[in-house]
Structure formats: C-alpha cells, structure tokens
C-alpha cells in the first residue's frame, strides 16, 4: 500500500490536466517553513518526524475511507506503532459520527472537468444530517485556508456533473496526543472557487511559459 501511483487525469481528448492538489500546490506555504525551522531549533529531525506522522495519517485516512467503502486494506507493511496510533485516530473519527447521520453518495471518487480542464479525487460527498456535504479528511496539526480552496476545486467538479454542494467540511483527525480533533464547515465556497480558478489560470500560464 505504501507505493501509490500518481493519479493522471486526462480529458476525453487525451489531454493531461492538473489535479486539484497540483493547482493548490502553486501557493507558497510559509507556515510550513516556519514550522520546520522550529523543529530544527529543538533538535528534532524534521524528515523522520514528518515521515512517521505521515504514515500514521496515511493509514488513518485509509481506515476512514475503508469504513465507508466497507472494505479492508492490508496494513502489514506498517509498524505496529503506526497502526495502533492510526486506529486511535480512526476511533476519534467514529466518535464524531455517533451524533450525526452520515450517508455517503460517493467516496474516493475521481472526476475530470472537461470544461475547465482539471481533475481530482475527493474523499466524501454525501448526506450529513440530511445536507449534501463535501468532506475532506485531514490528519495534521491544524486546518488551513488552502484546504477550502481544495474543497472548492472538488465542488466545481461535482457541480459540472450536476451535483450540488450545500456544505463544505474539513475534518482534521489527530494522529498523536499533541494534535486536536478539529471540524470547520462553510455554507458557501463561492469565494474559494474564484481563488481556485485564478490558481488554475496561473497553472496553465506557467505551463505555457515552461513549455
């Protein structure tokens, strides 16, 4: 499971188009640089720290998707420590579902925009307490604004397919005790969609310049 091929998105005409995450990747992330510098000053090996937490996050994320897809993934490549911590993360997600009616319509669904020329694979689109909700599951130490730009990209894909989004939601699931379970939702992604479209335009302009 550790080696996952990079998803390539092509239009019906065979044109390779960017993913939502590639488009969002245009943004500079100074907070990550500051965070890495802080760890370095504390004598922490940033690469090992990130790799360990990334593995926990990857497994926890997969467990959540498997829950909705009613399937099981073989995690034997991962250490017991990683799996145990990921299971704790998954349990915190299950706790969140207890007070809500969560009904998936699409899980881990890939879509391509023939109109705007980009693709993406979103985590969850379905009903949460009766509202059509787009959810992205994150595992990290906070919720950042660009996560909603990412949701906006997925929202554009869904709307092109004739599916409306009433609410966008980010669930940040903790991997370790120093992180918190966080939920943020928005009733409109209109501003975020404008930003995403600007980023998409920049992506294509840069691609032209670079040839």
PLM regions with names:
Residues 109-202, 206-209:
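Nucleic-acid nuclease catalytic cores
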């Amino acid at each position: 499971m550790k080696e996952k091929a990079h998803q390539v998105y092509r239009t019906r005409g065979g044109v390779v188009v960017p993913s939502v995450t590639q488009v969002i990747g245009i943004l500079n992330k100074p907070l990550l640089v500051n965070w890495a510098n802080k760890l370095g000053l504390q004598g922490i090996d940033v690469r090992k720290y990130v790799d360990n937490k990334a593995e926990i996050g990857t497994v926890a994320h997969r467990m959540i998707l498997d829950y909705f897809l009613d399937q099981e993934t073989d995690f034997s490549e991962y250490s017991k420590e990683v799996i145990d911590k990921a299971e704790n993360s998954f349990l915190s997600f299950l706790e969140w579902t207890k007070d809500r009616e969560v009904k998936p319509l699409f899980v881990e669904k890939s879509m391509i925009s023939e109109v705007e020329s980009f693709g993406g694979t979103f985590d969850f689109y379905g009903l949460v307490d009766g509202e059509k909700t787009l959810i992205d599951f994150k595992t990290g130490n906070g919720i950042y604004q660009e996560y909603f730009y990412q949701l906006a990209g997925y929202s554009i894909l869904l709307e092109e397919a004739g599916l409306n989004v009433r609410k966008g939601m980010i669930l940040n699931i903790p991997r370790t005790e120093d992180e918190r379970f966080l939920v943020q939702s928005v009733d409109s992604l209109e501003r975020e969609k404008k930003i995403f479209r600007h980023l998409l335009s920049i992506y294509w302009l840069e691609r032209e310049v670079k040839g």
